[in-house]
């Protein structure tokens, strides 16, 4: 794979920092390598809202911890109670929170839209850089409505320093990192620097360069390493801010390029197309040949839906007959402006403005040949104002505009290469607000968000008219318009100075995506042929959470119970199962799915308890469990009888797909000296036997990780040397939450690295 021109840029950013290390001064700040629960009033605060509110189940993961974690967001957060990963090789991994993923979890890049297409497919990387971040915040409650609707499991905000918000001490500050890993042969360098320019300007540059090979796997098909699990990444960013006594305004430009393989990627169905529309409908409604997503219920051939395929010899998913191995070539350019100002107008305490634009593209390739390409252009603007207290009330209100233009097209002009998603445009207009009332030991908080969506496809109306030989009435080609209204209420009771009890209730509404509305094409990553449903309604959920947190001198615990009940839950309904000669004969075959809606019910528990028997030792246990069911599924039309009658067949309730198995953990951290820490983390992930249709049992596994850190402050900065061993038992690890649940994750791996702050 050819090196990109971004590599010299990244390396130059890292080298800029080296001569400046001598300017750093000694400090006594220790490195916190733990996940922080937001319980005590003096704990670190989230940066996501002007009110700095939190519930007892919120989490903050420090940047120091993230420097030693995987660079993909899902893998970096995996292990936090309630959070698992949906891994897809070495290049993509999304968080699975309380059994939810994708569009039911909002991921932000420092309060702004990520602008990627990670929600579209599990093999698409999320465009955030955890290895360069200041912290990652997992937030729940009313504050999530400041950013989007439908966040039933929470909001993940990756806070960074691309746009400086304060002047660096002594005129310069920064950080450098280097690490090597054996499991995936990873080599990673990262760094960033802030340079004061005069009294008010700050220049920031940062970069990351990562190169990794196929990762090691134990006992898998006589392979030592998983083919096509390699991943390379290069990121560079430059920002400039003006900082004054009342606030700041800054801009930044970031350029990220990824190249990573696609494991278990098969071309077996390349010569297939969907047969889902009645032949008579294709003749009478010729626009369906151009735009098959315009089909209605009466157009669907429920007697024999399925795939029609030409001959293609591919008995092994790893034995590609095409020109080369499958991989993704990705580039993301981000332009950003942030500003925050104190006392901007009479009656208001603070103003926050955030503008960002993303130009995202990736090509799916076989060797050097482009097979599919994905585009997403995002423009986002939001303004948030915090008003002065009105009695006990403090509040923050704002508006947001979001526009996305995206597509998923094929580069091959074959009839069977149906584009999965045509050029489309989505516009969101949102109004949001959060109000908070405080008493001595009790806080009541409410939030609201109203979100209007307009989703449209650009049709060639002249071509439709020309092909309409029989003057058949045309369907509505207008935009899909809907409005989501979400509300949340949370109470936080500090019944002692160390205790926090939070009760949160919400009604959330999520609008269907253009993929769910208009898709019509093969999706190899999920082994499906997707058919959109332009008649989808908004998804609704009623949610409740009870969380208890305690933080004392020796004990710390955080416990949470939750339930999410959905109406109009959007899911992919399989059509080619037992409905004619084209039906699948094996659960591993490609499914023909159409987006539909049903009820759903998710509930679970998560928690962690820590105890310090001595000032130098800390032991703890953790665990999580989630259960998900699809309920009240719509009846499917049966086969037409000899009299022309078509009965409807009721569908039984089902287990929700890809719900993580239960997990228990044991943790030990020891401060061996003032400079040396050691930690042990053991997890038991149980087998998942509660299976959705077409799923197979995922075996459980034991995970043992060890690590040690050595810290030293010198005149050259704060140094932190670390070593760690992951999956020390070399277990075969399979994740039920992944679309590749039968593909193992990385085996035993040893990592060594160093970070220095100055």
Curated annotation (Swiss-Prot):
GO terms for biological process: siderophore transmembrane transport. It is found in: Cell outer membrane. Present in outer membrane vesicle formulations which are used as vaccines in human. Residues 50-161 form the TBDR plug domain. One of its GO terms (cellular component) is cell outer membrane. InterPro entries: Plug_dom, Plug_dom_sf, TonB-dep_rcpt-like, TonB-dep_rcpt_b-brl, TonB_rcpt_b-brl_sf. The keyword Ribonucleoprotein does not apply. Residues 171-758 form the TBDR beta-barrel domain. It is a multi-pass membrane protein. Its main location: membrane. This is Probable TonB-dependent receptor NMB0964. Residues 1-24 form the signal peptide. Pfam families: Plug, TonB_dep_Rec_b-barrel. Keywords: Cell outer membrane, Membrane, Receptor, Signal, TonB box, Transmembrane, Transmembrane beta strand, Transport. GO terms for molecular function: metal ion binding; siderophore uptake transmembrane transporter activity. Gene3D superfamilies: TonB-dependent receptor, beta-barrel domain, TonB-dependent receptor, plug domain. It comes from Neisseria meningitidis serogroup B (strain ATCC BAA-335 / MC58). A motif (TonB C-terminal box) lies at residues 741-758. SUPFAM superfamilies: Porins. It comes from the Bacteria. Probable receptor, TonB-dependent.
């Amino acid at each position: 794979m050819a090196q990109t021109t971004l590599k010299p840029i990244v390396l130059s950013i890292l080298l800029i920092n080296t001569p400046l290390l001598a300017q750093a001064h000694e400090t006594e700040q220790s490195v916190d390598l733990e996940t922080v629960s937001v319980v005590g009033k003096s704990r670190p605060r989230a940066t996501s809202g002007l009110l700095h509110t939190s519930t007892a189940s919120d989490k903050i993961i420090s940047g120091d911890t993230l420097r030693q974690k995987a660079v993909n967001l899902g893998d970096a957060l995996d292990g936090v109670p309630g959070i698992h990963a949906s891994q897809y090789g070495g290049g993509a991994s999304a968080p699975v929170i309380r059994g939810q993923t994708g569009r039911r979890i909002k991921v932000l890049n420092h309060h702004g839209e990520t602008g990627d297409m990670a929600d579209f497919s599990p093999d698409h990387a999320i465009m955030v850089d955890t290895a360069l971040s200041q912290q990652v915040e997992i937030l729940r409650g009313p504050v999530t409505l400041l950013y989007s609707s439908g966040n039933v499991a929470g909001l993940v905000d990756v806070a960074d320093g691309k746009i400086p918000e304060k002047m660096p001490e002594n005129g310069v500050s920064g950080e450098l990192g280097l690490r090597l890993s054996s499991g995936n042969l990873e080599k990673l360098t990262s760094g960033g620097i802030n340079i004061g320019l005069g009294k008010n300007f700050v220049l920031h540059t940062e970069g990351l360069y990562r190169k990794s090979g196929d990762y090691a796997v134990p006992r898998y098909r006589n392979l030592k390493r998983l083919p096509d699990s390699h991943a390379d990444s290069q990121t560079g960013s430059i920002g400039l801010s003006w900082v004054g006594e009342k606030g700041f305004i800054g801009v930044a430009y970031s350029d990220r390029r990824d190249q990573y393989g696609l494991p278990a990627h098969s071309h077996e169905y390349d010569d297939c197309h969907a047969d889902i529309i009645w032949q008579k409908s294709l003749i009478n409604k010729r626009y369906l040949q151009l735009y098959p997503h315009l089909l209605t219920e009466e157009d669907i051939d429920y007697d024999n839906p399925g795939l029609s395929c030409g001959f293609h010899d591919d008995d092994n998913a790893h034995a590609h007959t095409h020109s080369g191995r499958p991989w993704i070539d990705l580039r993301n350019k981000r332009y950003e402006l942030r500003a925050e100002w104190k006392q901007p107008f009479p009656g208001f305490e603070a103003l926050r403005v955030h503008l960002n634009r993303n130009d995202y593209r990736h090509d799916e390739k076989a060797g050097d040949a482009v097979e599919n390409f994905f585009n997403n252009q995002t423009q986002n603007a939001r303004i948030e104002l915090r008003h002065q207290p009105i009695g006990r009330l403090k509040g923050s209100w704002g508006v947001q505009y979001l526009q996305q233009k995206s597509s998923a097209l094929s580069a091959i002009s074959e009839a069977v290469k149906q584009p999965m998603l045509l050029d489309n445009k989505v516009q969101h207009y949102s109004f949001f607000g959060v109000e908070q009332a405080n008493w001595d030991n009790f806080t009541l908080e409410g939030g609201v968000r109203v979100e209007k969506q307009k989703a449209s496809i650009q049709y060639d109306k002249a071509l439709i008219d020309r092909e309409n030989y029989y003057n058949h009435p045309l369907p509505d080609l207008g935009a899909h318009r809907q409005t989501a209204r979400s509300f949340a209420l949370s109470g936080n009771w500090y019944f002692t100075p160390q205790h926090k009890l939070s009760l949160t209730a919400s009604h959330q509404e999520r609008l269907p995506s253009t993929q769910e509305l208009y898709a019509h094409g093969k999706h190899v990553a999920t082994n499906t042929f997707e058919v959109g449903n332009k008649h989808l309604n908004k998804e609704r959920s009623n949610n409740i959470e009870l969380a208890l947190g305690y933080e004392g001198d020796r004990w710390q615990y955080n416990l949470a119970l939750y339930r999410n009940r959905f109406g109009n839950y959007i899911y992919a309904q399989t059509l080619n199962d037992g409905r004619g000669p084209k039906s699948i004969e094996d659960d591993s075959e490609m499914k023909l799915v159409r987006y539909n809606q049903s009820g759903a019910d998710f509930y679970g528990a998560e928690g962690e308890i820590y105890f310090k028997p001595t000032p130098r030792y800390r032991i703890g246990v953790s665990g999580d469990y989630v259960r998900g069911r699809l309920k009240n599924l719509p009846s499917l039309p049966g086969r037409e009888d000899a009299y022309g009658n078509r009965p409807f067949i009721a569908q039984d309730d089902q287990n929700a797909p890809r719900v993580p198995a239960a997990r228990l953990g044991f943790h030990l951290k020891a401060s061996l000296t003032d400079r040396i820490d050691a930690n042990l983390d053991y997890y038991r992930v149980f087998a998942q036997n509660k299976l959705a249709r077409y799923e197979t049992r995922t075996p459980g596994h034991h995970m043992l990780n060890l690590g040690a850190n050595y810290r030293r402050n010198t005149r050259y900065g704060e140094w932190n040397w670390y070593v760690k061993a992951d999956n020390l038992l070399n277990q075969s690890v399979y994740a039920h939450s992944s679309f590749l649940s039968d593909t193992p994750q990385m085996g035993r791996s040893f990592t060594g690295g160093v970070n220095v702050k100055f």
